Amino acid sequence: MVLAGRGMPGTKECLICLTALLLAAAAAAMINGVLDAKLDARMARLHRRVASLERIGAQRATVAAAGMLFAALALSITFLPRLTTALILLAIFSYTPLYTLWFKRRSPWGVVPGGIPGALPVLVGASAVSGTISSAPLILFLVMLLWQPPHFWALALKHQDDYRRAGVPTLPLVRGEAYTKVCIFVFAALLLPASLALWFTGACSARFAIEALCLGFFNLFSCYLYLVKNRRFQRAFQASIFYLLGLLSAVIIDICSRP
């Protein structure tokens, strides 16, 4: 929203958009939990999610998800541009039927198209502010698409036994650890030119470019340190979160500090 509006958005539109996004995301997560219940039950790290769903019940969870989705769409249709509503619907559709029921269960590369719903909130926020989608939010959308696969693969490396028991064909299980680590490095490297495109197109300043470079090299070094040298996959997962938070913060500070 900051990038598209070239500054902090209005309080009202920001709250409405964030509320609609949170409701839609919560609804999608609950539906995902219901659809993946049998898979989750085989994974030790998800025992709390399974226990929570058992206490609530699949039917109640589905009804609650439908209610939250209705509320999200009602807010969006009433107060936000039509494009924003369409993008919210696209995010839900690409996550629930496409990723959860298709890509995740059939391909080790499913996380790549599965990153679309995770990146679409960037365009949702941009369209809520301007009613259109300009080049700068599209670049940030690309950054989010490139960031998500290596972020997930680090987690998949750590929890290989869980995914094996669940029968989910993750990249480490299908192609091996070494191949997965190479893919993580490739995607981490691609984040450098993708983030610098915000400076190259004039959306952000040279100061941001320096910060993006530093963060990008930090991300690559973290991949080497935690994937190759020490095999501490959880740390690699956490470092990627720090990278993204740093990059998004740099964008906001750069835009909002301009005279």
Curated annotation (Swiss-Prot):
Other noteworthy facts: Carbon 2 of the heme B porphyrin ring is defined according to the Fischer nomenclature.
Protein family membership: Belongs to the UbiA prenyltransferase family. Protoheme IX farnesyltransferase subfamily.
Keywords: Cell inner membrane, Cell membrane, Heme biosynthesis, Membrane, Transferase, Transmembrane, Transmembrane helix
Cellular localization per UniProt: Cell inner membrane
CDD domains reported in the protein's UniProt record: PT_UbiA_Cox10
Function: Converts heme B (protoheme IX) to heme O by substitution of the vinyl group on carbon 2 of heme B porphyrin ring with a hydroxyethyl farnesyl side group.
Gene Ontology MF term list: protoheme IX farnesyltransferase activity
Recorded topology in the membrane: Multi-pass membrane protein
One GO BP annotation of this record: heme O biosynthetic process
Disulfide bond annotation, renumbered to this chain: none
Entry EC number(s): 2.5.1.141
Record's keyword annotation contains Cell inner membrane: yes
Known catalytic reactions: heme b + (2E,6E)-farnesyl diphosphate + H2O = Fe(II)-heme o + diphosphate
Name assigned to this protein: Protoheme IX farnesyltransferase
Gene Ontology cellular component list: plasma membrane
Pathway recorded for this protein: Porphyrin-containing compound metabolism; heme O biosynthesis; heme O from protoheme: step 1/1
Entries under InterPro entries matching the protein: Protohaem_IX_farnesylTrfase, UbiA_prenyltransferase, UbiA_sf
Enzyme class: transferase
Pfam families tied to this protein: UbiA
UniProt cross-references to Gene3D superfamilies, sorted A to Z: UbiA prenyltransferase (1.10.357.140)
Transmembrane segments: 15-35, 61-81, 83-103, 109-129, 137-157, 182-202, 208-228, 236-256
